[in-house]
């Protein structure tokens, strides 16, 4: 069993007062963009009428809740961030924002996002948003990430919940469709983050994070990436023959999934040298495009169906 060093290193002292850009960085805007986009698709797919103001309110609350979770993640992981090249320039390690400031910022945003969603939209959606924040901050950040190589697999549930929250904002209930969206993101998460972990392996090892390549080795990680990619392709395509999504989505999901599978096979085959590094980077980059494209196609289908209803 590997011994992981999780002892923190001293953080940089405050070098100046925090600016707006520092607090925006705490929100993890790149992650937030994915949260907003998948939530928007979930909201527009939901049946029934929904006032535009409430729709905008729901999306903003989900985005702010996701940002709050990101800020609380940075608050708790300041020791890890300081050790990793990829994260050393974040506001807390750089001394731009203190840990108490990040904690206060994150808790305030979390509270107001949940309460606002509950009061103005409905409390089922608010409860799901609160659970999402709790799962990401407590279950994933505080527990899973430091203690198990399955951190990404289990913790990925938090990142898969935004379209479920958005659907519940409209309907006040759950259904098969948002669960399908959840499953797509859930199975997408391991190949995406394990590809990152492969070419950032030294970074994670230095920080004491038990990512799969650190604990089980790169070769086992490559196998798991391939297996989860196969599962992802099947899960993403399944809604079409089951009658939940249309043929355009079905064909596109197979095409996108087929190429992602090709990239995963390349990761599995190339195990050393520049070819291995190139394969993992290509899979990581394409996985981002894959998810955005898949949900964009769903968005187009929803908008097209709405237009046809109006002119029909």
Swiss-Prot record:
Principal EC category: transferase
Principal subcellular localization: membrane
GO cellular component annotations of the record: plasma membrane
GO terms for MF: protoheme IX farnesyltransferase activity
Subcellular location: Cell inner membrane
Pathway given in the UniProt record: Porphyrin-containing compound metabolism; heme O biosynthesis; heme O from protoheme: step 1/1
Chain ranges passing through the membrane: 31-51, 52-72, 119-139, 152-172, 179-199, 225-245, 247-267, 288-308
Superkingdom of source: Bacteria
Membrane topology note: Multi-pass membrane protein
Catalytic activity, reaction form: heme b + (2E,6E)-farnesyl diphosphate + H2O = Fe(II)-heme o + diphosphate
Matches recorded under Gene3D superfamilies: UbiA prenyltransferase
Record flagged with keyword Lyase: no
EC number in record: 2.5.1.141
PROSITE patterns: UBIA
Biological process terms in GO annotation: heme O biosynthetic process
Keyword flag Lipid metabolism: no
Alphabetical list of Pfam families matching this protein: UbiA (PF01040)
Record keywords, A-Z: Cell inner membrane, Cell membrane, Heme biosynthesis, Membrane, Transferase, Transmembrane, Transmembrane helix
InterPro entries: Protohaem_IX_farnesylTrfase, UbiA_prenyltransferase, UbiA_prenylTrfase_CS, UbiA_sf
Entry's family note: Belongs to the UbiA prenyltransferase family. Protoheme IX farnesyltransferase subfamily.
PANTHER family: 4-HYDROXYBENZOATE SOLANESYLTRANSFERASE, PROTOHEME IX FARNESYLTRANSFERASE, MITOCHONDRIAL
Function: Converts heme B (protoheme IX) to heme O by substitution of the vinyl group on carbon 2 of heme B porphyrin ring with a hydroxyethyl farnesyl side group.
Note: Carbon 2 of the heme B porphyrin ring is defined according to the Fischer nomenclature.
NCBIfam families, A to Z: cyoE_ctaB, PRK04375.1-2
Name of this chain's protein: Protoheme IX farnesyltransferase
Gene source species: Rhodopseudomonas palustris (strain ATCC BAA-98 / CGA009)
Species classification: Bacteria, Pseudomonadati, Pseudomonadota, Alphaproteobacteria, Hyphomicrobiales
